[in-house]
UniProtKB/Swiss-Prot annotation:
This is Chaperone protein DnaK. NCBIfam families: PRK00290.1, prok_dnaK. One of its GO terms (molecular function) is ATP-dependent protein folding chaperone. InterPro entries: ATPase_NBD (IPR043129), Chaperone_DnaK (IPR012725), Heat_shock_70_CS (IPR018181), HSP70_C_sf (IPR029048), HSP70_peptide-bd_sf (IPR029047), Hsp_70_fam (IPR013126). Signal peptide: none annotated. Induction: By stress conditions e.g. heat shock. Acts as a chaperone. The modification Phosphothreonine is found at T172. Residues 576-586 have a biased composition (Low complexity). It comes from Geobacillus stearothermophilus (Bacillus stearothermophilus). PROSITE patterns: HSP70_1, HSP70_2, HSP70_3. PANTHER family: HEAT SHOCK PROTEIN 70KDA. Residues 576-608 are annotated as: Disordered.
Amino acid sequence: MSKIIGIDLGTTNSCVAVLEGGEPKVIPNPEGNRTTPSVVAFKNGERLVGEVAKRQAITNPNTVISIKRHMGTDYKVEIEGKKYTPQEISAIILQYLKSYAEDYLGEPVTRAVITVPAYFNDAQRQATKDAGRIAGLEVERIINEPTAAALAYGLDKEEDQTILVYDLGGGTFDVSILELGDGVFEVKATAGDNHLGGDDFDQVIIDYLVDQFKQEHGIDLSKDKMALQRLKDAAEKAKKELSGVTQTQISLPFISANENGPLHLETTLTRAKFEELFAHLVERTMGPVRQALQDAGLTPEDIDKIILVGGSTRIPAVQEAIKRELGKEPHKGVNPDEVVAIGAAIQGGVIAGEVKDVVLLDVTPLSLGIETMGGVFTKLIERNTTIPTSKSQIFTTAADNQTTVDIHVLQGERPMAADNKTLGRFQLTGYPPAPRGVPQIEVTFDIDANGIVHVRAKDLGTNKEQSITIKSSSGLSEEEIQRMIKEAEENAEADRKRKEAAELRNEADQLIFTTEKTLKEVEGKVDEAEVKKAREAKDALKAALEKNDLDEIRKKKEALQEAVQQLSIKLYEQAAKQAQNQQAGADGATKKDDNIVDAEFEEVKDDK
């Protein structure tokens, strides 16, 4: 059974963790970083993911960022004449995380727990699950990000406590209130905003810089795609720097040009100015905080700990606003970038049976119901109901002799159906005509542990039943998913071949370099015919490299290795021969010395 990895699939960055020996561990990417940018780029038929994709975003218009904002919608991104759904782009990121997790673990990975914002609706959750399937992962559980963070924080805590998780991600904002005690993590309430995050903080800086430049030079940089990408990078960098310093320099030379020549953007942004620009965004996060407290029936005094999640919670003004609202300092003991993936890995351990005595009770973030007469939204399951759950209600017909009932399933909080999110529609047909108000139709909603909705309608008179697993208008059919899985596998195979080809070329280059070095060293020491053979093999490999024919490179590389090996053998033989000759010479000298006889002499005295 393969290990279950925990994945935080973020708007800006993603992170993957695994449970090893009962301890959660974040898996670093090939560049050695613990988080990976959620960026995908397409270049000359090749797919780039993560750091490499982000680095070339300025010059490559075929770069996709923040795709998570479009999950669960019918948005498509067109690249090189092909349209990609958010699920496919997300699957490319997941595939990359999966591949380096496999390299780290040394075994195939097929199972995962993937996190989503608590406020994600059914369509967004389903899209995330589909992305996992396309990437070749069996998604064991979809878990809410704040809940995962609470799991990571509270696993080793003994005392009972009420915690508030404030999760300000790259593109989404969530707040969840949980009660922790005896290994039970119970979500009491959740609230949020799916269109508020760190990207919006970057955007206020971009808008400010565009406005400044327009006033100074009369040029609108927002119309220039490449300039805009440079502004995005500068804004993100400035935002991060202003969490640690009170002012930062933004310098973008040659950002544009006019008839007088190139134009540069040079400005200083202070923390005070930045705080003024994003004040309305921080205030927007306070609405869901108050809502969650109200739904949980709690006051700020009832909160024991505040856990911060997401890179944007490092902004001092954000921390200050939370402290003002809740009257206490946020807890700084968790890494806001990694805590969600760690929680997902722990949940994976719970599913696999590696983590004992942990029970997770999550809630549905939005109310669920159906449209009834007059376009009214009738709720069957209220928001913040613990999941998994099931709820039934009996409805009847609105007209005489009605033989078909349309069931319009919705999610939201507004009183009128038209103002809420449609999850799907289906029909109950084939029951006998009867006066209005007579038929009894039981509608049952089931929400599973992933927060995914299943609905069935049953005519109690005939016991006829119709059921549906909600597929939103933006959802993918099974055929589409299978096609995308096949494409993803083919692309993974193509990526593997590309990597192998690059490695082969590197090995060939290295061999040519070492051969040239060896040829210089053996000059005059071995037979010239052997040297010539190696030189010809080296030139043949060079020619194959220029042609870029991989089979040819492989053959010529083997031929050169053989020639160099022969050269080494000859060199060794030559050296051995020389050593032998020297030894023989030394032995001969010793034999000559053997004829020397020691003589004794006696001194003769003349006066004898």
